[in-house]
Structures are given as C-alpha cells and as structure tokens.
Amino acid sequence: MTRLLALVSVLMLSSFSYADHHALALEARQSTSELEMTSITVGDDFTVINAETLFEIYGRAYMTFTLSYNAEGNGGTYTFEGRAYLDEETAASGSGAGVWNRDGTKISMHQLVNVLGGTINLDIITIDPLNRTGTHDVYAVK
C-alpha cells in the first residue's frame, strides 16, 4: 500500500507540472550532496542500499533504501528511512517512498520524504554502485 501511495504521489506531482501549461517550479533546499554507499544487500525480491552524506541543512545523514523490482528487473518502487545529525543536540528523521530505474549501472531514484516536523521534500538521487558514489538533490515541496 505504501508503494502504491508513493507511486501515485510522484505521478500526481509530475502531472501538476503540465497543468494549465505551467511548469512546476521547485526550489532547491541546498546544493547537491555527494553520497557514499556504505553497503548493498542483494536479494531475490529486493535490494537494500545503505548510504551516508553530509547535507548543508540536515548535517550528517544515514540512509537506507529498500528497492523492490519490477517484472523486468530494471526499476520499481522503494521505501526510504533516514536519520540526520546536525550537531550534538539536534537530530532529525525522515521516511519516504519513491520510484527507481536503472540505466546501465546507474540507478536513478525519485522520492517524496516526510521529515520530522512536517517538512516535505522531493529528492532526486543518482547512485553509481560500481564506484560506491552518488548524488542527492533536495527540493522543497512543503
């Protein structure tokens, strides 16, 4: 059910960009962050990717992506959990869901994230498993 809700949400956001011929303008919350993949666990039904980064606005963040496959195995849906530590007294958590696809060895992911406190982000993530790197862009939805 969560996956279906995430997929519908992403599709709705993309359809808003074409409503009345107006483009959807999203504001970046920060510059692009570089990801470091810390582990990948591959299974028959899903793959789990763990990564970390240093965000300008959230501080040190640890993320887990659980990817389910489509019939072709080159995309699907996923869920996300993240924890961030801005300083010794400030922590935040977020959860979300999205869609992913693979082009060659690169994985492209689009997710909606509900951050503790009511903030909603659209994240666009590109992962390069071969080099254990990636990029993470964060856009303000709410």
Where is each model-derived feature located?
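Beta-strand-enriched cores of mature, soluble protein domains
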Residues: 18-142
